[in-house]
Design a protein with these regions (language model features):
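Membrane-proximal intracellular helices of multi-pass ion channels
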Residues: 1-171
Length: 171
């Protein structure tokens, strides 16, 4: 016991870390989507609409309150695309990716959380598995983009490039 009578320090389980990670990404996404720069009309988006959109993107459900192509600006669409990507890869996989990109070593606790997140049989090889997941994901998205590119560019010009990328990632 401490002076206050309670000891509040507690270790979070891997499951709790994943839940908090998802909730944090959803909340951050909602706050960014509320900004005027995220809406094509350059007006503030109500919190409940931004939260619904962010939650739907991270949970990759595809439900929307506003039409993505007309309501959101290019910035807002990019935020939604990143939320879809993080949700699709998983918050823990995305976190390990950022750690790898920063050049920082991944701790045993982080490897253990990743093992739980992807149901890996062992902690060993988590970084290699993460690289495999990322390469596979981006390869499939690249093939999808290249397949959609001719039709979208024919119908929408240069805007079709962005549309092909967005549809490939969100599919």
């Amino acid at each position: 016991m401490t002076e206050t009578g309670f000891h509040l320090k507690r270790r979070l389980t891997s499951f709790q870390i994943m839940i908090l990670g998802f909730a944090g990404v959803i909340l951050l996404g909602a706050l960014v989507l509320m900004l005027p720069i995220a809406a094509a009309s350059r007006t503030w988006t109500p919190f409940h609409e931004a939260l619904f959109t962010s939650t739907s993107a991270v949970c990759v459900t595809g439900l929307v309150v506003q039409d993505t192509g007309s309501y959101w600006s290019g910035f807002g669409q990019t935020v939604i695309l990143l939320l879809i990507q993080v949700g699709g890869l998983g918050v823990i996989t995305a976190a390990v990716t950022f750690l790898m990109l920063s050049g920082r070593n991944i701790s045993l606790k982080e490897r253990s959380a990743m093992q739980d997140a992807i149901s890996a049989p062992a902690v060993g090889g988590i970084v290699r598995l993460t690289r495999f997941i990322l390469k596979g994901t981006f390869l499939v998205e690249l093939v999808g983009t290249l397949a959609l590119l001719p039709a979208f560019c024919r119908d929408y010009g240069l805007r079709g490039v962005w549309m092909a990328i967005f549809h490939s990632v969100s599919a």
